[in-house]
Amino acid sequence: MMKTKYLLLPLLASSSLLSHMAFANNHWPDLPIGVKNGVSAQIGSKVYVGLGSAEKSFYVLDTQAPQNGWTLLAEFIGPERSGATATVVGENIFVFGGSGKASDDASSPIIFDTVYRFDTQTNRWHQVKTQTPVGLLGASSYSPDGKQVLFFGGYSKPLFDKYLADITRTDKKAQPEQWQKIVDDYMGMEPLAYQWNRDVLSFNPTNDKWDVVTRSPYLPNCGSATVIDGPSITLISGEIKPGLRTAEVKTFTYGELQPWQSTYALPAAKGQAQQEGIAGAYSGVVSNTLLVAGGANFHGAKAQFESGQMFAHNGLSKAYNSEIYAKQKGVWQQVGQLPEGLAYGASFSVKGGVLMVGGERADRTASTKVYLVGLNNNQIDIVD
C-alpha cells in the first residue's frame, strides 16, 4: 500500500478549530503519470513513488529542489503489482507483497509472497531470497529501529487467491448466478473469517529471517494510514473486511511491555450520522498537528453491518472523500476539505506541510496531482 513515513510531533497548544482554506498554485510538480495503489518511501528530502497503476515505473523527487521535477529511476524487476507495502532500512527501500499476475499469461491474479530491495545509491533492484510468511496485501509496515521491518495486517493469501481464481474463471454473463454466489459468499463473511494477519511480524534484512513480535488485540485491518514517531507507529482507520472500515486509531510502540494504545477515533464527517472509517487515506504532521485527509469508504456500510448484513457494502457506491481531520489536544476535528475526493495515493511530511502525491479519483482514474497541505495562522493552505 502507499504508506507514510513521518515524525509525530507534539500537538498544538491551541485548540482553535481550523476552518478556513487558502489555495495557491504552481509550486509542486505533477507526476509524469498517475499513480494509485502503489508504494512510497522517504529518505531525507527525497520521496519515492511508483508501481501500482504506474506498472513497473518508479520515481523520485527531491523536495528541496522541486523545480527539478520527478526523475524516473530503474524499472522494477518483478511482476507488476498493486497494494504492496514498502519500508526504508538504511539506503534501501524494501517492497513486500502486493497483488497482480505472476506472468502475462497467468489465468488470474495472486497475492505475491516475494520481496524486493531497491538500492537508492546504485539505482538497482534486487530480489531478496525470502518468502513472506503471510499475504501482505494491504498491510502497513515500518522500521522501529532502522534495522528491522514490522508489519500489521494483510490479506490471507490462500483465501484471496482462491476467490480471485474462482471469480476470474466464471463468466458473469454466461453464469450470472454462479458468479454472484462467489461474490456473495466471499463478501458475506464475518471479519475474522477472512483470516487477515493479526500478528505483528518482523523481517530482518541482515539475515532475511522472519519472526512474530506479538499479536494484535484488535481486529486485523488493511489500508490504514500511518504516522511514524521513532519506535512508534500510529495506525489510522483502514478496513476490517472488504467494504467495511473502522474509525479506530491506535498506536504501537516497539519494545514496550504493553505496546498497544487506543486513542480517540475519527469523528463523523459533517453531515453524516457516523464515521464510516476510511481506507487509503493521506496522513502526516504539519505545524505540530497530525492531519488525515481523503480516503475511500462506502457510506451506509456500517449501518448495514450493524443490522446484520455481513455483505456490508452490498448495493452501495464507493465514496472518495475530501475531508481533512486534525488532531489537537488528543481530539480529532474536521478542519477542511481537499480540492477533490482522493484515496490510495502517497503522503509525506516535508517542510511546510503534508505532501500528497497521486491517488485514485472518484472516476477510478489515477491522479498525477501533487498537493502540499499546510497550516498558516490556523488556516488550511493547499498548494499545488
UniProtKB/Swiss-Prot annotation:
It holds the Pfam family NANM. InterPro entries: Gal_Oxase/kelch_b-propeller (IPR011043), Kelch-typ_b-propeller (IPR015915), NANM (IPR056734), NanM_proteobact (IPR019936). The keyword Signal applies. It catalyses: N-acetyl-alpha-neuraminate = N-acetyl-beta-neuraminate. The active site is at 239 (proton acceptor). Its EC number is 5.1.3.24. GO terms for cellular component: periplasmic space. One of its GO terms (molecular function) is racemase and epimerase activity, acting on carbohydrates and derivatives. Keywords: Carbohydrate metabolism, Isomerase, Kelch repeat, Periplasm, Repeat, Signal. Residues 1-24 form the signal peptide. The keyword Isomerase applies. It is found in: Periplasm. Kelch repeats lie at residues 46-90, 92-145, 147-184, 185-230, 233-281, 303-352, 354-383. Converts alpha-N-acetylneuranimic acid (Neu5Ac) to the beta-anomer, accelerating the equilibrium between the alpha- and beta-anomers. Probably facilitates sialidase-negative bacteria to compete successfully for limited amounts of extracellular Neu5Ac, which is likely taken up in the beta-anomer. In addition, the rapid removal of sialic acid from solution might be advantageous to the bacterium to damp down host responses. Homodimer. Belongs to the NanM family. This is N-acetylneuraminate epimerase. It comes from Vibrio vulnificus (strain YJ016). The gene is nanM.
